[in-house]
């Protein structure tokens, strides 16, 4: 028998610019501040939570490869709480929410947190030949951010997907523009009413 699921709180950080004021802040630090704020807003104690689902598609710091555990510990969640990392390109935040909901629905968790973060400003460069030495030729720095944007199969940028789908399925521009306008109008209404501002942790 599945359990009823309720959302107790929601919070987000401010959106930063690429190379902006947040560029020197490790992703797990920013994420843990947001999770702590979410716990506080929920009215529950950090010790009450038994699971954290965390998603990031582009690990940017040495402690972000298992971000769920690191963020959970930095946020004051119990050491024996579950920690699950989700890696899904596009809609990963929604996938984290679904995974946390499944934990509760199946009775495996009582209180769970779904969280995620991307810090593209901190994406590293890699020298893949440096570990065993470069016998000859040039060493090349690989921009790991580039691989966060590209499809690993076609090597196309994921932003090109819209054009590809339009060509394949014959989508028309007008309905998409209407949908985009509706989204912008909703965003403006959320900003003007203060709803969005109340969600942001300074």
Regions found by a protein language model. Give the residues of each.
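Short glycine-rich or small-residue beta-strand-to-loop segments that form or flank ligand, phosphate
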Residues: 52-56
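Short polar catalytic/cofactor-binding loops
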Residues: 10-15
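Conserved PLP-binding active-site segment in aminotransferase class I/II-type PLP enzymes
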Residues: 4-9
């Amino acid at each position: 028998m599945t359990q009823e699921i309720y959302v107790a709180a929601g919070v987000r950080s401010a959106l930063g610019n690429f190379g902006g004021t947040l560029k020197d802040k490790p992703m797990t630090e920013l994420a843990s501040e947001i999770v702590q704020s979410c716990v506080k807003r929920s009215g529950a104690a950090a010790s009450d939570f038994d699971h954290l689902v965390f998603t990031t598609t582009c690990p940017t710091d040495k402690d972000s490869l298992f971000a769920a555990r690191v963020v959970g510990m930095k946020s004051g969640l119990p050491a024996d709480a579950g920690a699950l990392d989700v890696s899904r390109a596009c809609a990963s935040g929604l996938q984290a929410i679904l995974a946390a909901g499944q934990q509760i629905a199946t009775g495996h968790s009582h209180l769970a947190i779904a969280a995620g973060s991307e810090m593209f400003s901190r994406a590293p460069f890699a020298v893949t030949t440096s570990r065993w030495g470069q016998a000859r030729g040039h060493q090349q720095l690989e921009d790991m951010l580039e691989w966060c944007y590209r499809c690993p199969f076609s090597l196309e940028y994921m932003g090109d997907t819209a054009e590809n789908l339009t060509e394949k399925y014959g989508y028309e521009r007008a309905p998409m523009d209407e949908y985009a306008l509706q989204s912008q109008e909703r965003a403006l209404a959320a900003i003007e009413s203060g709803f969005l501002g109340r969600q942001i942790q300074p």
